[in-house]
Amino acid sequence: MSIKEQTVAKFPVEPFRIKVVEPIRQTTRAEREKVLQVAGYNLFGVRAENIYIDLMTDSGTAAMSDSQWAGIMLGDESYAGCRNFFNLEEAINSITGFRYFVPTHQGRAAENVLFTCTVEPGQSVPSNMHFDTTQANVITRGGDPVNLLAEKGLDPTSHAPFKGDIDVERLEAFIRQTGPENIPLGMLTVTNNAGGGQPVSMANIRATGEVLHRYDIPFFLDACRYAENAYFIKLREPGYAETPVVEIAREMFSYTDGCTMSAKKDALVNIGGFLAMNDEALYRRACQELIVREGFPTYGGLAGYDLEAIAIGLNEVLDENYLRYRIRSTEYLADKVYAAGVPIVRPAGGHAVYLDAKALLPHIPAEQYPAQALAVELYRNGGVRGVEIGSVMFGKPQPDGSEIPAAMELVRLAIPRRTYTQSHID
């Protein structure tokens, strides 16, 4: 065993037992080559039955708990006023403190409703780093999604503890240059999915809120992975080591005016999301949009049993035994990959390991999409499906036919929650 291999810590013990299983099968390289050709080398076009280890996303791929499945049997499918809505309302209020919320079928629908209610053509929405659906929803409304990630977050080799932080000085300079009247809201994505799953510090959340509120600009979190971010704060930020994660989460939300959330991440379910806020006028507008796009405000495109599963999952995810396992098991894969000599974003994020395709494949220029090439090779050689987070996803086409490449060329290996064991990871 090499010195590098000896430094890799053991895989954490899973804090759960497995009750239901789903068969998967290994394919041959020849089979996978044919699959790739049929799919046009687009991994989104590959049928799930042809994937051995599917690390494309952690969204909606979690294994639900026995409590969540039991809750599904309590689904109240009344069109209006189902009891599951009020159970979810209680869960959201107890964790976030927000007074109002509307359920949606997933996170991008919550973004759609929010930006439809707030963004006018020509306005800008600053963030640490918008993910692709958030960016697309802002652009669809005629707005400009602006990324102001701190410089440390753009260096895959940096070991800074909070590489998801926004550059607060640049944020204030941007507000002054653009004009507060042209910024309907500001956002932070926690954790920063487009930038390596890196967390945002409490100090940065607080400072961002102070800057935005100084100019009367509402502040929203993209809270898909709020529990993972809260646990990183507990691990890495001075003063929080003894603070329960639920209290850290409440403090995170206390500096903001609302949030969007895909419940398919840190609510441990397969479908669902919500938009929450304190502004009653915004809530009323959101309800009107919801009825047109999603459904009545007490179901929002979801069955009652889905609402119940989300309510249970929002609290389950705050179990520190689970979070310890979740963060450490991701770090375990990162350590293994790094020990094998593959450049990755360091330190490991909460939900995924990000391979640095730009460093691994320096001979492939950005305009030939090195991260997409690497993702295809991972599937071709091992049957593992990841996803490109680079110029295919975030490149900006120009009128002259050229393209501004993404800041980083990454392949994300997102680990579904409570789904794979150490044998799969190894």
Language-model region placement:
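Conserved PLP-enzyme active-site core in the AAT-like
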Residues: S2-Y41, G45-M64, Q68, E77-F101, ...
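Conserved glycine-rich beta-strand-loop-beta hairpin in the small C-terminal domain of fold type I
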Residues: T330-E331, V345-A357
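Conserved alpha/beta core surface patches that mediate binding of polyanionic ligands
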Residues: E169, I291-G295, V384-Q398
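Short glycine-rich or small-residue beta-strand-to-loop segments that form or flank ligand, phosphate
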Residues: G75, T260, R412-P416
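Short, conserved charged micro-motifs
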Residues: R284, P362-P370, R418-I425
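Active-site loop ensemble at the mouth of alpha/beta enzyme cores that anchors a bound cofactor
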Residues: K358-R385, P399-A406
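Short acidic (Asp/Glu) and glycine-rich catalytic loops that position anionic groups and cofactors
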Residues: C287-L290, L307-E316, H351-L360, A406-R412
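PLP-dependent enzyme catalytic core of the Aspartate aminotransferase-like
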Residues: V317, M393-D426
